[in-house]
Amino acid sequence: MSKLVEKIEHYMAVSKELGLDLSEDLISKATEDLVPSIYQQDAETVSCSDSAELDTVKKNFLANKLGVDADDATMDTAIQKVCEAMGTSNRHKYRALFYALLAKEFGKESIYP
């Protein structure tokens, strides 16, 4: 089994465990889109307590990748909602799941064809 398949299966299990309403297809495509960062321990997760990282998510992912045309408050609210959905005490907020939830929140799942 390839490392990518192992990551996808792990993220699917975590998604199920956390009760996230994400399809296997969306998780798979979000994970594939994040190679090679999913193999780097620090880059694999999102820290909801790091405002600089959340600003990067907002600018690079929401605005640039997804093309979200919303004010900062709306994007901040969506990011906070995802942080809470993944569990505030959860130290393993995997970037693939985080991005998939944000894409779903803004109705932009089609970014992952």
Regions found by a protein language model. Give the residues of each.
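Amphipathic alpha-helical interaction segments
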Residues: D25, K29, D33, T77, ...
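Short, residue-level hotspots on alpha-helical faces of the histone-fold
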Residues: D33, N60, N64, A100-K104
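Strongly charged, low-complexity linkers/loops
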Residues: D50-K58, L66-V82
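Short acidic, glycine/proline-enriched loop segments that cap or flank alpha-helices
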Residues: L22, T45-S49, L66-D71, A85-Y94
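Core of compact, soluble alpha-helical bundle domains
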Residues: S2-N60, S110
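Short amphipathic alpha-helical segments and their helix-coil junctions
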Residues: E9-K16, D71-S89
